[in-house]
Amino acid sequence: MSRMESPLEVPLSGGNVSQVVLVADTVRRVPSRASGTIQRLLNYPTIAALPWIPDHFGFDVEGRECIQFVQGAVHHAEPDWLWNEHILLQVACKLREWHDATIGFDRTDTIWNLLPRSPDEVICHNDFAPYNLVFEEEQIVGLIDFDTCAPGPRIWDIAYAAYKIVPLVPDDSVPYETVPTENSSRLNETELRRRLELFLKCYAGQDKNLLYSVEHTITTASERLLVLADWTAAAARNTMNSELPVHESMYRQHSNWLKTFNNKS
């Protein structure tokens, strides 16, 4: 029996748009409106050449997407080592690799699940976060969940990745509207800025044109979270998922906190 016809299916957690199952060494998922575009994207030569990007095998006999399963672990629980500096640098480097590999991808007749943003510099992953990264022994070996990919500016992706991995969030023990102090973030102000600057410098590498400022990144992250909050609110109305309004509220609170942080700085 071929891989494309294997009947044994194991449910997997995750997936932004559709249910996901494991069949042999492939991931199968009900296609979204953007699946044809995502297939083209993952098969784009410079993207397919990245060893940590899964292969897209097309669609199985049931019409589901068939994507290579990446061996490793996805850490939704955020282990302590996730905040080590070498992880921060890896995320920045991988994001830069992804962006550079998407340059030149033909947008003709493409369909995306999210609206493209201007300027159209690269194809943003739009959810480049620890829960979509596959690790082996604290090394990134894979990126998953491409449902939210869409054209946009580099900083749009950079800001969200920084929000997740620096992280640019207040501590859960204090009100989000509190003016940032050394006790209102997982990091004190100096350390937060240091980690964000390190992330931005690693992403830019030798290209000074890609070195974004801390202030611009935080401002963009705040805007990004408001857009995400609006998207989450719409999804909540459409799905009646009781958890989504909680997430929407969190994104709005975090966005306001980032505005306050920038104003204080």
Regions found by a protein language model. Name each.
Residues M1-G14, T260-K264:
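Actinobacteria-biased recognition of intrinsically disordered, low-complexity terminal regions
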Residues L8-H125, A129, E136-Q139:
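ATP-binding pocket architecture of kinase catalytic cores
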Residues E97-T108, P130-V134, C149, K164-D171, ...:
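Alpha-helix capping at helix-to-loop junctions
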Residues V122, A129-L168:
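Catalytic activation segment of kinase domains across protein kinase-like and atypical kinase folds
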Residues L226-S265:
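ATP/Mg2+ or Mg2+-diphosphate-binding catalytic cores
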